[in-house]
């Protein structure tokens, strides 16, 4: 079990400790369930009333909340960020693989860095390069001439197609497919002719990709995911999409081909983004957004109808279907009013 002293917690978070720096903690826990040996945090002031009864060894909070807590306190600028840093330090998640399994199939010319781990039944094809400390989970497939940077981890059954380039310090969850063919077809009098997808996928450093996400290879140029991007589970990123630095996408979102998404964007879950458009830096799209045209200015954008009771929704839907009729009636009324003004 990993343990940290409160002095070490203060160093990790950059916080100011009020208490015994030699006391140890071994687990992060929610405030209502924390006990001896646990560290917890207060990020929402409305829960400050519970501090008096909190049994955690130490609480991370803002300076203005310190008066509510009589035990060990770590004063930090942002308790939620401090929680993330401490959770990383106390992380007990096992590695996807440890060492090279006897059943792994590794091409003789594959280049493996120092301390590489490859799980059972993984396949590493010819020309592959794996950097130092790369971890390949059980059942993964790494295609010809692909390259994976140092410290990157792939969980079980990830598929990396030929020539895909993945940077350093990335994390890819189970079942994700990177570099499969984009949806490219030409129509010849009703017959669909497949267009070979001759580009690849380039993924930057410190990128995280959730489970069962698909990122298609480019048709001619590459599909590009820049540094520090976070992609959730079950996303579809089509061919030649370019996602900018630090952008985040929750689950279920679909991005059609050749669309460029800027830096530091936040795309809400289950959104649909049209192809061949551009989204500016700093755009925030709320959940289930349907983006059909380019967005040229940063800001918050929404579409769709928020949840209503079924009765209210049916009335709203009926009114929407009558909008054209109502518009014609309104124009007719306006015309009559204008005529009366002239008279």
UniProtKB/Swiss-Prot annotation:
- Pathway(s) where this gene product acts: Bacterial outer membrane biogenesis; LPS lipid A biosynthesis
Q: What's its EC? A: 2.3.1.191
The GO biological-process annotations, alphabetized, read as:
lipid A biosynthetic process
Which residues act catalytically here?
Answer: 239 (proton acceptor)
Q: Does the keyword Cell membrane apply?
A: no
Q: Which reaction does it catalyse?
A: a UDP-3-O-[(3R)-3-hydroxyacyl]-alpha-D-glucosamine + a (3R)-hydroxyacyl-[ACP] = a UDP-2-N,3-O-bis[(3R)-3-hydroxyacyl]-alpha-D-glucosamine + holo-[ACP] + H(+)
What the entry lists under Gene3D superfamilies is as follows: 1.20.5.170, Hexapeptide repeat proteins, MurE/MurF, N-terminal domain
Q: What class of enzyme is it?
A: transferase
What's a Pfam family this protein contains?
A: LpxD
Q: Which PROSITE patterns match?
A: HEXAPEP_TRANSFERASES (PS00101)
Can you cite an annotated GO cellular component?
A: membrane
List the CDD domains hit by this protein, alphabetically: LbH_LpxD
State the InterPro entries in the record. Answer: Hexapep, Hexapep_transf_CS, LpxD, Trimer_LpxA-like_sf, UDP_GlcNAc_AcTrfase_non-rep
Key words, A-Z: Acyltransferase, Lipid A biosynthesis, Lipid biosynthesis, Lipid metabolism, Repeat, Transferase
Q: Which GO terms describe its molecular function?
A: N-acyltransferase activity
* Homology family: Belongs to the transferase hexapeptide repeat family. LpxD subfamily.
Under the subunit heading, UniProt states: Homotrimer.
Role summary: Catalyzes the N-acylation of UDP-3-O-acylglucosamine using 3-hydroxyacyl-ACP as the acyl donor. Is involved in the biosynthesis of lipid A, a phosphorylated glycolipid that anchors the lipopolysaccharide to the outer membrane of the cell.
- Database matches in NCBIfam families: lipid_A_lpxD (TIGR01853), PRK00892.1 (NF002060)
Protein name listed in UniProt: UDP-3-O-acylglucosamine N-acyltransferase
Give the originating organism. Answer: Vibrio vulnificus (strain CMCP6)
